[in-house]
Amino acid sequence: MNIDTVTCIFFSPTGTTKILAEHIARGIGAGRIEMVDCTKRSDRKKCGPFSKGDLVILATPVYYGRIPEEILPYFATLKGLQTPAIPVVVYGNREYDDALKELYDIAVAGGFLPVAAGAFIAQHSYSTPDRPIAEARPDANDLNKAQAFGTDIRKKLAVSESIDAATLSKVPGNVPYVVPKNLNLIKEARKSIPFTPETDE
């Protein structure tokens, strides 16, 4: 299997998800890499449908162990035609809970065939100098791992007879997806935090 184009579709309020997705794409080494930033609502334009010759990276941070509600509707509009895909979640050094499973399910529902899936650590959006959480991540080692992950995917696809043969049958996570007991309290508290990442101007 040869991949002509890698399209990275990413939601990245703090920029770290974008960086990790880009390094994965570099590792895959396709002739063309397209970066689609869907962080701001104004940038969420129709994208696709994608073909079998494409490879799509879907990348997002983890909020409360889930995919951010903000980006769920847009990801659900993406359509593949048996297109290989790589769901990627980025979390702040605690747990990613059911986020990877949720993103995997979104991809499958959209006609994509996940050939790999990854979870990477980045500095938490609530990290402060007084209370650092995964400070300065991803670091050089993290980025090397992300690029190596992409290289491994390229090698896997090169020896696979078909997309179906390369497709993952499952990823870590559960259904129904986790619902934090204090989710509403968290959302209310988050509104008052000045360093909460913005997703639009």
What function would you assign to each model-found segment?
Residues M1-T7, T14-R41, K46-P197:
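FMN-binding flavodoxin-like domain, especially the glycine-rich phosphate-binding loop
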Residues D200-E201:
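Iron-sulfur cluster-binding cysteine motifs and their immediate structural context
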